[in-house]
Amino acid sequence: FGASSPARVTPSTAMWTAITMAATGTDPLTVSVTKMSGGAVTGPITETWKIAQGSLRGIIYYETYGSPILGGIASVGIMKISPSATTPTPVESGCGNVCHTASADGSTLVASTAFPAGSASYDLTNNAAVLNAKGDNSFTYGGIYPDGSIVVSATNYRTWVPGFGGGPSRVYDTHTGATIPTPSWDGVITNAAMPAFSPDGQFIVFNREDTGSGHM
């Protein structure tokens, strides 16, 4: 175990089924892993997991660090796991390619592309082809509309800090990168941290950091 000797354990489908079937209600799941190599025993490493009740539909996109699939201990990037798949696949890799948001319909992803500045939107229906690339962080951790058409920039994550590009929270077209004039938002909301749309796109929630001490 550890950085000098990383190990990966991949439970079988049957094992995951048994785990999820057994972990019901509020019962926690305890996982203990011991490594045996060359006559030496390392561990155990023990963790307690709480399995959420319910099912997830569609593809899951997530940030990853140090994955052997992306290149090992120093790698960073975005990966995805598809329904019934046993192994994740890379979407984007490299420094900065972790801070992302995917649209609810699975069509569009927005993400950081570089540090300290750079972001882009991607077409998830076309092998994550770039839709629009920006030299600032307007798309980084943005609140993306359910159909992927627009994104509200997430302030207080490099987007409005002087020197990092970007500015006050704005609404952008994910395909063109153009700013969409929004009278009810522009000049009213300046710092909108962690924005997220409701599933029907009728509401948006965020931490308003320009007033109210960051209250939602």
Can you annotate each of these PLM segments?
Residues 96-98, 138-140, 165, 191-193:
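Beta-rich catalytic cores
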Residues 2-26:
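Signal that preferentially marks extracellular ectodomain short beta-strand elements
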Residues 24-38:
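Internal, hydrophobic beta-strand segments that form the core of beta-sheet-rich folds
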Residues 60-66, 109-112, 150-154, 203-207:
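Residue position within the beta-strands of beta-propeller blades
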Residues 41-68, 135:
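Low-complexity, Pro/Ser/Thr- and charge-rich linker/hinge segments at domain boundaries
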Residues 90-95, 132-137, 184-190:
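Surface loop/turn motifs at the tips and blade-to-blade linkers of beta-strand repeat domains
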Residues 34, 71-89, 113-132, 156-184, ...:
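Beta-propeller blade-edge and WD-like acidic-aromatic loop motif
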Residues 24, 51-57, 101-108, 141-151, ...:
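Blade-terminus and WD-like Trp-Asp/Gly-His loop motifs, strongest in beta-propeller folds
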